[in-house]
Amino acid sequence: MNASVFRYLLRHDFRLELRKFFLKKWMVRYGVILILLLAAALTIWGEGRGFRTQYLLFLSFMLPYLTFMISFRVLIREWKDGTIGWWITLPYSRSSLLLAKFCAAALHTLLVYALFFGGLTILALYSAAVHGLEAVPLQGWFNGEAIIAVILLGQAPLLLTLGLLTAAVTHSRWVALTPLLWVLFGVSGNTLSWMAGILLSDQPEGWANAALPGWIWAAIPGAWVLAGLILAGAIHIVSRQVRF
């Protein structure tokens, strides 16, 4: 398959999911309402009154779960919309079809991460403007954002491929493995909070002096290799075991 066809498949999956989920009016409204509520909380209870700006970073713990669900939705949609027969019989290899969905899900994930951290940064700057730079240590804030972003990007391919595999297994002869995959999803999604607990356990000043240990950097390539193996498993199931 040439590059132009792959771009078409990628663009199709990306735009379809964008219209079905990201561009819905209720998503925009909920996002605006949430930001306004958090801004109000920072204004009333911010910093010395108990609600430190750095606590907002813990909202990122939901992102690994959302990452999995993005890729799960991209593939499971073919069954829900009744288009699995059309999609799977397209004159392209199963690996190309799954790779296009993986890339579309990855782009959606990057979009979510950008919106999330952009929104949190606006809230942090607002809190600093209200309470002063001495009360809101922005250096620690940006350090925490960078650490969390590295962990999220490091584990994202693993969660994305696990989402595709789970969707494929759900409608295959291996459906009995579905509960096990959902357990793996729960454990993998909790990795960020587990790592944050380790990093902050001996940091009384929170994220200000936290740093990623070497073993996390070393684990990221291994996670990406494992993601490649999981994607290969999903391709095999879609090619030989899927029911439609």
Report each predicted region and the residues it spans.
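Active-site alpha-helix of zinc metalloproteases
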Residues: 8, 96, 100
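Central hydrophobic cores of alpha-helical transmembrane segments
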Residues: 174-187
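Perimembrane helix-loop junctions in membrane proteins
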Residues: 77, 81, 124, 128-132, ...
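Short helix-to-coil transition segments within interhelical loops
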Residues: 88-94
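Hydrophobic alpha-helical transmembrane segments
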Residues: 1-61, 65-66, 73, 146-150, 168, 176-179, 217-221, ...
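Secretory targeting signals
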Residues: 37-67, 99-176
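Transmembrane helix boundary and interhelical loop/hinge segments in multi-pass membrane proteins
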Residues: 51-54, 70-88
